[in-house]
C-alpha cells in the first residue's frame, strides 16, 4: 500500500486523558466497543442515504449499505468495514484526533477514582470510536469519502497513546475500514460465535445489516452472513418488541450505559401520520446545563434519516427527552430552517410534548419512588415549564414537587395536589416562601404565624423558583401567595381584627410614627404586625413590588434591578420592641431601631450593606 503525505500528529490533550480513563474504567464492560463501532457505521450509512437524496451519484453504483466483520486469528486482528459516507483527511483529523465537544475539559476534571461511577460518566459522554482501544493496542483506519476519487483515501493509525499517523492512500471503495490489533488476552473477539452473541445483544434493532465473514474450509470461498434483524425497531409492532430490545435501542441512540427510566412507542394515523419512540433517561446528561448542550430527537422522514438533535420537536424544558420521530408529512429535503416555520412541525411538537407529559403523569401516579428518581435528575428543567409553555401550565404544575413545612425535610416530595388536600378549613391560598437555601426558608421568621396556626408552607430554595412562581399564579382555583409579601389574607390569619389588639396597637401609634420619621425614605412603610411569635421584626414587600429573590436573580445575571423598598413590620408583643418603644433618648432610640431593621434585613436578604456597623450596634447594646 503506497502512502503519500504521511505525518505524525499529537492527540488533543483531552483525547489522551479520555483514552486512559476508558481503558481503565470501562474494561469490565469492554464488549461495548463493538456496539459503539457498529453504531458509528450505522450513522455513516444514515448520512450517506440522506446526502444521496439530492446527490444519488454518491452511491457510486452500490446502494446496498451494510457493515461487515471479519477476523484473522493468526494476525490477531478484528476488522469492521462499512460502505457509508466515509471521511476526508480533514474529517479524519477532526473526528479521530480531537473531541469537538464543549465542556469536555470540565467533564474530564469531574472524573474521580470511583470506577463504577466513572464508567457511567464516560459512557454518558459517548466514547464512540475511542472505545476500540479498550481491547486493541493499535487501531488502523482506512477510509474514503463518498464521491471522492480513489486516490483521496486516508490512512490513520495509532497505539492510543500520545500521537497518531495519517497519510493519503488509494482506496477503491468508499466508506471506512477499522482494523483492531487486539491486546493479549482478548482472543474471545476472534471467535465467530462470540461476535454473533455481542452483535445480537447490541445491534439487532438497527436498520443497517451487520454481516460476518464465513469461510468454507474446503475450498476457501468467502460468504457474508447477515446476523442482525436489520429492521428499524420503531417500525415493528409494539407487541413483538421486548423490553430488552427497547433498552438496547435507547443505549444505541443515546450512547448511554444505563437503562432508560421509561419509554413510549406510538404510531399515529389520520390527519398526521408519524411514529414516535420517546425515552426518559434515568440520569441527566453530564452537560445538560451547558449552553451548547445538543438536545432534541432524531428525525426520520418516511424511514429515511434526516438529522440528529432536531430540537424543534420538543420544548426546551423537556430537553432531556431522547428518542426519534418518523414523519410521513415532512418533505425529504427538509432543513432546520424549514422545520422552524413549519405548521407540521408545530403540530408534531404539541403532540409530542403532551405525550411526554402524559408519560410523566402516569409515572407519578403509578410509581412515586421512580418519579422521585426522575425529579431529582430533571426537576430543575421541568421548573422552566410554566414560563415556557403556557398551554400546558396546569399539567406541568401537577408534576412539580416541593419541600414543605409538612415533611420537615429538604427532599422535594410534596405535590400541589398533596398540599391542596391538606389545606386548613377556610384557607383560600397556597402559601410559599423563596430563599437562598432550604435552611434559610425553613427558619424564616415569616413562617412563625403558619407554624402557630398549623398551616403548611411550601419551601422554595432553587434559584429558578422565584422566576417560576412569577408565572405560576394559581392551582386548582387557589392563588399562590408568598408569605414574604404583604397580603390581607395574612392579616386575617393573624386575627388582627380583634378589639383588644386594635386598642394595644393604637397606644403604639406614636412609636410607629417616630420610627417612620427616623427611617424616612429608606422604607416604604412602618407597621405593627401580629404575624410574629419569636421575632421582633421582619421586612415584607407589597404584592406588586419586586421580591428579594427576584432582585438577587437580576443581580446574579448582571442586570440592573430597581431597589426593593421594604415594609418594616414590628411585633408589638416582643420584649425588644417594647424596650425600644420606651427609649426616650433619640440617639439610643435610633440605635435600637437600626438594630431591629438590620436584623430583619439580614433574615430576609442574608447580607447587610454594612455588617461591621451591625456588629458594633449589637455589641454596644449587649454591654449597655
Swiss-Prot record:
Major location (coarse): cytoplasm
Region (C): 553-624
Region listing for B, in residue ranges: 337-552
SUPFAM superfamilies with a match to the protein in the record: ATPase domain of HSP90 chaperone/DNA topoisomerase II/histidine kinase, HSP90 C-terminal domain, Ribosomal protein S5 domain 2-like
PROSITE patterns assigned to the protein according to its UniProt record, in alphabetical order: HSP90
GO cellular component: cytoplasm
Similarity comment: Belongs to the heat shock protein 90 family.
Function in brief: Molecular chaperone. Has ATPase activity.
Protein name stated in the entry: Chaperone protein HtpG
Organism (species): Yersinia enterocolitica serotype O:8 / biotype 1B (strain NCTC 13174 / 8081)
Gene from which the chain derives: htpG
